[in-house]
Amino acid sequence: MNKIVFAVIGAGWRAEFFLRIAAMLPDLFEVSRVLVRNEAKADRFQKKWGIPSVTTLDQFLEKRDYSYAIISVPWDANPNYIAEMSKQGIPVLAETPPAPDIDGLLKLHEELPSNAKVEIAEQYLYQPMHAARIRLARSGILGEVSHVQVSAAHGYHGISLIRELLGVGYEKAKITGHQLTSPIVKGPDRQGLPESEEKVQSVQELAIFQFGVKTAVFDFSNVQYFSWIRGDRILVRGDRGEIVNDEATYLKDFRTPITSLLRRIDTGHGGNLEGYAHRGIQFESEMIYENRFESGRLSDDEIAVATSMYKMGLYALDLGPSFYSFAKAAQDHYLSLMMKRSIKEGQEVVTEIMPWSSR
């Protein structure tokens, strides 16, 4: 296919992910323009990235030489831009979440045209190992999956993994949440490495979700993304097997258990001269995940973001299906907000079937 051409609204830390990926995959992606409201920042941005920068929405809309618009702005600005682009007939890939709160989600649901092409850039489902686990969970090898435990991402990100691994939709859920604190030696953060040893408090959110007969445990600590000593944990259980992190155990028949690894395949290790890249995830004799962006030498999170960008390019041109719709994103954020309500109130909450479930 031809290059996927997109435009970007926003110039923050997260917006640069999309520009960096486009720069690393120039045969696949091209950035048409970036909307930066502040003139001085727009000038700096254009010099840094070599991409035309505009400062008004009218300028952004003046020449529609892009297939879709990426919206990467603060939470409170996100719904207005999503609604405006949709009314203009422009396909949208918006950052998570689509609106800050439940009222905002409901309002945006009402405002969006029925034919709006709005997808949300939830990348965790497309990180290589998560994508491999999801595929294995859906393959039937574990039997019917009825329980998962996810400690890999905060809020709606973690819940998106829970719902995909469990295979649940928009049904009601019972949620019981708790918050725990514990001391930890401070590690790196967005600003870089720690300059001295410092003990801080880690805040951990725990919640049990009940979707009828299916259950899940959400577990995430606020230091987990950067900490060297707080790792991710994933458990997926079916009636014929389970996945524990990168190991799957299943029944070949009722008396023959098999244990196999989800094995990461990378190039560039040791004497391998192909150059460093992630190739895919192998399970037994099959590559259950293959990285289509191997030439870009991307990190796992960049691979995941690039996957959303690629899928959006296909969807915008009617060459592929919806992949993470407004409705899916709204449901994940709704469940996250209800989890926080349970934590705050110290009691079980019960969710409702929301209007976007029929979208």
Where on the chain are the PLM-derived regions?
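C-terminal glycine/acidic-rich active-site capping loop/insertion
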Residues: 198, 234-235, 240-323
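Rossmann-like NAD(P)H-binding beta-loop-alpha module
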Residues: 128-147, 158
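C-terminal helix-rich "cap/oligomerization" subdomain common to oxidoreductases
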Residues: 3, 68-70, 287-359
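Short acidic low-complexity segments
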Residues: 52-64
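Rossmann-like dinucleotide-binding domain that binds NAD(P)(H)
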Residues: 144-235, 357
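N-terminal Rossmann-like dinucleotide-binding module
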Residues: 1-49
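Short, well-ordered coil/turn residues at beta-beta hairpins
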Residues: 72, 95, 219-220, 238
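Beta-strand-loop-alpha-helix segment that lines the small-molecule cofactor/substrate pocket
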Residues: 63, 68, 73-75, 79-125
